[in-house]
Amino acid sequence: MLSPFEQFLRRATAGGIVLIAATILTLILSNSTWHTAYHAFWEQHLSLRWGNWIFDQSLHHWINDGLMAVFFFVVGLELKREFLVGELSSLRDAALPVIAALGGMLAPALIYHQFNPTGPAADGWGIPMATDIAFAIGILVLLAWRIPRNLIIFLTALAIADDLGAVLVIAIFYTPALHIKALMIAALLLLALLLFNRSGVRHTLPYLLVGLPFWYFVILSGIHATVAGIFLAFTIPARGRILPDELADNLSAHGQHLRDTITHSKRLNPLVNGQLAGIIQDIRNLSVAALAPQQRLEHAIQPWVTFAVLPVFALANAGINFAHISVNMLFSSVTIGTCLGLVLGKFLGIGLSSWLAVRLKIARLPAGVRWRHLLGAAWLGGIGFTMSLFIGQLAFGDPRLREEAKLGILLASLIAASIGLLWLFQVSRKKGDVPA
């Protein structure tokens, strides 16, 4: 049976492949004879009505405000798991990836700011701060047999810490005017969710029933809906209703009951043997009760996010018409600032902050990981894609600036992935580099 981390790696790798395929399809559609219909499709409106109440959004907004809230909900579940029992659960283990993530966010923002110090373009400083976990881990796993396993764990923890930083940036710097009444209602709903957690509610339905209006009022408050996904995830209980030892005792008793029923019954089909079906259902309910709601939801939703939400997001946001790319667009301050911020900023920020943390004995390199491995991971940190595209949509209202940022993100992701892959392939050929 695969460990949770191995399951995560498998999903991330497959998800990266699907995301690449969706991006290629998007670029094909954007540069085909269907490009007008392609763009018009995402501007179609979808409305929800109930009496006099109406909630009307374009498909593009439903994806960015709705589906991406589900993505951030899963990110929140992953963050909570990492803080409780994962690589970020202890200061000693979390120090290096967290410091590396901070450096990897500050340096790209500073580089972008050097090219765009004033004007509307200056609002895009948050675009190169993000790392796409699916792409970066997917590339790294291609070399899993040549590199230390702890390098994959390091980059995963870094990307998760990076996601948290991106969420904070969105919440603090990309939130327009706040609507206090809606914010107060959202706060009351969040309080109700926290009370569910503290009072031992382990069924997921109450969290869903309160979580949906919470998401709606967060949107009305002016805060981006993705923040609602993170907060909702943090309220989901991380403990099951029964403990493992209690589960073992109950399973032992039910197992004996099941054996006795099988021995004394001629009908062994649960469809026609109600007693047998009842015992099996009790065993199933006990097993579910032992799993934390957080685990159940993450296991159930993450495949949908990996193979549906993110590819649909790419289809709606990654399209760029190459015929519209001019020399001015290619060398615009937004394109260059975004591209250099991701490629050089991530490499320098992650590399230098990690070196400084180890040098000052604040952190240590993971077992089996050498500096040349870590620098390879730093190059891969420049794959910004999903989160960078998302922040670009929030940062710019001007379609021209959005297109320039999109071009910079695509170029940077391609360059960073190529350099990182070649770098790690080359340095892993050195003797003594046996995966740990």
UniProtKB/Swiss-Prot annotation:
The chain crosses the membrane at residues 14-34, 59-79, 95-115, 125-145, 152-172, 176-196, 214-234, 300-320, 336-356, 374-394, 407-427. Pfam families: Na_H_antiport_1. It is found in: Cell inner membrane. The keyword Methyltransferase does not apply. It catalyses: Na(+)(in) + 2 H(+)(out) = Na(+)(out) + 2 H(+)(in). Keywords: Antiport, Cell inner membrane, Cell membrane, Ion transport, Membrane, Sodium, Sodium transport, Transmembrane, Transmembrane helix, Transport. Its main location: membrane. One of its GO terms (cellular component) is plasma membrane. The keyword Kinase does not apply. It is a multi-pass membrane protein. Na(+)/H(+) antiporter that extrudes sodium in exchange for external protons. This is Na(+)/H(+) antiporter NhaA. It comes from Acidithiobacillus ferrooxidans (strain ATCC 23270 / DSM 14882 / CIP 104768 / NCIMB 8455). The lineage of its organism: Bacteria, Pseudomonadati, Pseudomonadota, Acidithiobacillia, Acidithiobacillales.
